[in-house]
Design a protein with these regions (language model features):
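Short, well-ordered coil/turn elements that cap or connect secondary structure elements
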Residues: 8, 65, 122, 156, ...
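Structural motif
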Residues: 11-14, 69-70, 101, 125-126, ...
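Pre-active-site segment of Zn-dependent metallo-hydrolases
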Residues: 45-52, 60-99
Length: 189
């Protein structure tokens, strides 16, 4: 079924970090030691020295010349993501409220455990998540710590939390839409 989502004049994507882990072989050994891909990511003793994270800044220009920005995912290792956000000016954009929302694609460690790096600069930012988020994912957003996996957030989210049901097209704004899918993925999420 086709759905008209409107149009925008341009889209720009800035890759802040696409390095989920620094050494693939070391990451695979970490996964094997933990018991394989079906373990609960929240209980794995992840090698912090090998963690990076995924995050991108999406900027669109509307037909009227207006500009909008959102952040796609928050990365993994907070120290790594703090440096990446500072390098790209994301920290300042968050502090100035120039980034409209954070869109979390899924709660895997390399896309979500870096949530504190976003919230330290904008705890009230609107966050969009799949409606399939697990309880521990919500707990991290509220400020929980999971010492065994080195995941923690000292900056509880105070803004709006928008949940998207799977398989529904959500118009975010003209020319930009979202669809999430409920898939069987590894690491217990």
């Amino acid at each position: 079924m086709k759905q008209d989502i409107g149009v925008c004049k341009s889209v720009s994507i800035t890759c802040i970090s696409e390095t989920s882990w620094l050494d693939g072989d070391a990451w695979l050994k970490n996964v094997e030691r933990a018991g394989g891909r079906n373990v609960d990511q929240w209980s794995v003793d992840w090698d912090e020295g090998n963690s990076g994270g995924y995050s991108s800044l999406i900027e669109t220009e509307g037909l009227d010349g207006s500009s909008r920005k959102f952040l796609l995912d928050s990365g993994w290792n907070n120290a790594y993501m703090d440096a990446a956000f500072e390098r790209e000016g994301i920290d300042a954009m968050l502090a100035r409220r120039e980034i409209e929302f954070l869109y979390v694609t899924h709660e895997h460690f390399d896309h979500y455990f870096g949530i504190a790096s976003v919230l330290r600069h904008g705890p009230d930012i609107t966050i969009m998540i799949p409606n399939t988020f697990h309880e521990k994912g919500h707990m991290l957003l509220k400020g929980a710590r999971f010492p065994s996996s080195h995941a923690g957030n000292a900056f509880p989210h105070t803004g709006e939390l928008v949940r998207h049901d799977p398989d529904i097209v959500y118009l975010l704004y003209p020319g930009c839409a979202s669809v999430t899918f409920d898939l069987d993925v590894p690491f217990g999420v």
